[in-house]
Every structure is written in C-alpha cells, then in structure tokens.
A protein has these predicted regions:
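Conserved hydrolase catalytic core segment
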Residues: 1-26
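Catalytic active-site module of serine/aspartate enzymes centered on a nucleophile-bearing elbow/loop
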Residues: 139-174
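Short, solvent-exposed loop/turn segments at secondary-structure junctions
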Residues: 20-22, 72, 85, 119-123, ...
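Helix-rich cap/lid subdomain of alpha/beta-hydrolase
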Residues: 23-83, 87, 94-97
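Conserved loop-alpha-helix segment in the C-terminal half of the alpha/beta-hydrolase fold
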Residues: 113-149
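Serine-hydrolase catalytic core
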Residues: 102-109
C-alpha cells in the first residue's frame, strides 16, 4: 500500500487482497501475533512450507521448492523473517509514521480501488473493512470475498482472482 501511495501517478486503479496498512493503537489478531512470534523464533524459516501452510490447498513439492528457491540458506531469509516484525507497535515506530502518511493519501485516493480478500486467511480475512468506505475509490466497486482461499490466494484461487482483476480492469478503463 505504501508503494501505491508513494507513486499515485503510476497507478490507474488498485486491487488489494489479503493485506493491510496497520497503525499503532489497533491491536492485531492473536493469529498475527502468533505468526510474528514464530517468525522471529523458529530456528529454520522454511519459506515453501510456510507458503503451503498458508494455502487452503496442498501446493505440491514442485511449488514448495519454487517458493524455497530464492532462499538457498537462512542468510537470504532476513527480509522474509523480519516482515512480520514491522507491525507498528508504538506511536513513533517508523512503520506507524509511514503508514499514517500512506493513510492520509488513501483517504483522498479517488481512483478505482477494489477489495478481493479471501475468507480463509486467519490474519487478513475481513480486512476489506479497513479500506471500503475509507478510501474514496472503493465507492461503487464490486468488492468480493473469494471463498475457499487462504493467504496465498494466487495458489488457491488464482484463476478466480485473475477473473476478478480482469473484470475490474475492463470496467474501469483509464
């Protein structure tokens, strides 16, 4: 989301799925806190296995291996490992400051903005409520909940998500 708000002129429309832009003062779910703790404490961060666990379907050994491929050893996983720890846990937390600035821009973002969250992600299910009605571009859009998808919607319901995106693009030409 911060990429969008830092480059508004480069986007004609936005589709968000299984994401968020949290601010300090709103406690995350217990599932997120468990994920955050796990990410910092597990000795071996098995990216492919984690992606498989975040999906509703079994990804298969070849897909798990593809998710592991960019990370030949633990030293390559620092970014993936630290990402959950970037949750803004204080008013002056750098993530909180950056997210506040991003929300200021989103509150006046009038370009078409569609939410397509899944129902099967324990962390982000229902996350569309953070955007719909708060981002002006969400008005009148056909927001959808993709049933049966986990966090990695592209794996569980990739064709359905692609259809939602294609329909949205066709309905909102630039």
């Amino acid at each position: 989301m911060r990429l969008v708000t830092a480059n508004v002129d480069r986007f004609d429309r936005v589709v968000v799925s299984n994401t968020g832009l949290p601010m300090y003062g709103k406690e995350p779910s217990a599932a997120f806190r468990a994920w955050q703790k796990f990410s910092q404490e597990v000795p071996v961060f098995e990216v492919g296995k984690l992606c498989n666990g975040g999906s509703q379907t079994d990804l298969g050994a070849d897909v798990v291996a593809a998710y592991d491929a960019p990370f030949p050893d633990e030293t390559f996983k620092a970014g993936a490992r630290i990402f959950p720890a970037l949750y803004p846990d204080g008013e002056n937390d750098p993530s909180n400051i950056a997210n506040k600035k991003a929300w200021e821009i989103l509150h006046s973002f009038t370009k078409p903005f569609l939410c397509a969250f899944t129902d099967g992600d324990p962390v982000t299910a229902g996350g569309d409520r953070a955007f719909v009605g708060k981002v002006p571009g969400t008005a009148g859009q056909p927001h959808t909940t993709i049933v049966g998808g986990g966090h990695f919607v592209q794996e569980d319901k990739g064709e359905e998500l692609a259809g939602v995106i294609n329909d949205f693009m066709a309905a909102t030409p630039k």
